[in-house]
């Protein structure tokens, strides 16, 4: 499937979810031992943790949306990464969407983030902490040129390279999605230490943030992991293909109905949503 078709599918998946979903009616984590269930784009979570809003190392954006829930592994990853960044004097980590209290489908903006193992992190590290007003209405910093072929040199900073590299080197991280132009710049800057680049995957948009995804926890037996990224640093022909014009004759895919929920997620909805 070519990249244009993939983009249209992603857009349709997002558009199909614009109507309110029953998952929004669950306002607190479902009690129980932490279990990520299903796939990243069709799943849920039992026993989610709440990311503490107050921290000296990070700040949480758009708290009014209440998307700061996730598997304990995700909460620990955020705390671990932000401590590393702080200890290196790089700035404050800005945390975007994680998941809803029980995971599940959003009413827009995300096709994934459903199992408590995904988090969006802004690609800027302010030295001065943001105000409450800034956090509620954050201003994204678009790092990619208008033509989409490279990063904006005046905006690309060594600490952003280091932030992505630190995240990719974390033992629990399986993928990081960034714009192809950002991946390209990482490839140029990486030098000889390149193993971590395998986890950094080019994807549509993601011009101002990275989307970090963790592996399925070993004790989440109903969690469905993605296949590992292809071997290598991903800096060759695969990356360059993202900068090629779409092939002629690309047709808009048919609108698809979301797949059935995993049985455990459907049972969770049946029990907790009237």
UniProtKB/Swiss-Prot annotation:
Compartment annotation: Periplasm
Cofactor: Zn(2+)
Signal sequence interval, chain numbering: 1-19
Keyword Hydrolase: yes
Record GO terms (molecular function): metal ion binding; metalloendopeptidase activity; serine-type endopeptidase activity
GO CC, one annotated term: outer membrane-bounded periplasmic space
Co-factor binding comment: Binds 2 Zn(2+) ions per subunit. Zn(2+) ion 1 is bound in the active site. Zn(2+) ion 2 is bound at the dimer interface by residues from both subunits.
Record-listed E.C. numbers: 3.4.24.-
Keywords: Disulfide bond, Hydrolase, Metal-binding, Metalloprotease, Periplasm, Protease, Signal, Zinc
Region (Disordered): 227-274
Entry binding sites for Zn(2+) 2: 147, 150
Disulfide-bonded cysteines: 44-265, 187-235, 216-223
Family stated for the protein in its record: Belongs to the peptidase M74 family.
Subunit structure: Dimer.
Reported function: Murein endopeptidase that cleaves the D-alanyl-meso-2,6-diamino-pimelyl amide bond that connects peptidoglycan strands. Likely plays a role in the removal of murein from the sacculus.
Entry protein name: Penicillin-insensitive murein endopeptidase
Organism: Escherichia coli O6:K15:H31 (strain 536 / UPEC)
